[in-house]
């Protein structure tokens, strides 16, 4: 994976699940990874593990709903390593509920994290990448960007937005690669903030067939490792036995 070695890769939502697995895998292949999330105690442990394995990693607290926070995170990556090659906008939440539960605060929070979080990452990194003449955005969408499920209407809408933003940016870019990663059901902390029983029941049903985070990390590695003239636009990764 020679096209991964020495690349500077910033990852949001890196304190667990897909973000953690991806950071460890990319570092194993020689990338310089910068981990961002709110839970810095978890980030510190992950970075220590990467260092103990001979990898290069840094971390910084970031709230992806804050444009200033995300800019500071990307600027930190550039300060530490001199450039930014890949921004993986991975942070997301999924408080499932039926629409008539009217969990309006949860809707707004989901929109802020899942949509604005991606836009903030793009806003922070795009001018730097354009000045460099190269770069790559990887954005976590979901199979929920391609199908709608009961209790997941708003979540699906946010993930379709991620897909649409990614596709629009791809069409507008000549030398910036854009990749959408659309996971199926993965065994992570996603959904731990569900407050409604209907949403909890739906998640249990979904997770009867699920992947481990490393399966998605492998997809990210594949997208990053391609030659610079090759843009993997979207990778959908489902369990083999997935019914959706």
Regions found by a protein language model. Name each.
Residues 142:
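Residue(s) in the substrate-gating loop at a strand-loop-helix junction
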Residues 98-99, 106-108:
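Substrate-binding pocket helix/loop in short-chain dehydrogenase/reductase
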Residues 122, 158:
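Active-site helix of classical SDR
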Residues 180-183, 199-243:
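C-terminal helical subdomain
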Residues 29-46:
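Conserved glycine-rich Rossmann-like NAD(P)H-binding loop of the short-chain dehydrogenase/reductase
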Residues 40-41, 61-72, 104:
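The beta1-alpha1 cofactor-binding region of Rossmann-like NAD(H)/NADP(H)-dependent oxidoreductases
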Residues 15-16:
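Conserved glycine-rich cofactor-binding loop
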């Amino acid at each position: 994976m020679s096209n991964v070695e020495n690349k500077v890769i910033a990852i949001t939502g890196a304190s667990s699940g897909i973000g953690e697995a991806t950071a460890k895998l990319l570092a194993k292949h020689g990338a310089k990874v910068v981990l961002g999330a709110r839970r810095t105690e978890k980030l510190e442990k992950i970075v220590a593990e990467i260092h103990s394995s001979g990898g290069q990693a840094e971390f910084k607290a970031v709230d992806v709903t804050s444009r200033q926070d995300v800019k500071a995170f990307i600027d930190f990556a550039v300060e530490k390593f001199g450039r930014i090659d890949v921004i993986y906008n991975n942070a997301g939440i999924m408080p499932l509920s039926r629409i008539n539960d009217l969990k309006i605060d949860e809707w707004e929070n989901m929109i802020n994290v899942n949509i604005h979080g991606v836009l903030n990452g793009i806003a922070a990194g795009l001018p730097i990448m354009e000045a460099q003449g190269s770069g790559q955005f990887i954005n976590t969408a979901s199979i929920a960007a391609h199908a709608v499920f009961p209790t997941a209407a708003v979540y699906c809408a946010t993930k379709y937005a991620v897909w649409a933003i990614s596709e629009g940016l791809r069409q507008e870019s000549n030398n910036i690669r854009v990749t959408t990663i659309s996971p199926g059901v993965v065994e992570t902390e996603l959904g731990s903030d569900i407050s409604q029983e209907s949403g909890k029941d739906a998640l249990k049903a979904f997770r009867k067939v699920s992947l481990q985070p490393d399966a998605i990390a492998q997809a990210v590695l594949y997208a990053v490792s391609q030659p610079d003239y090759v843009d993997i636009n979207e990778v959908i990764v489902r369990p083999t036995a997935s019914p959706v």
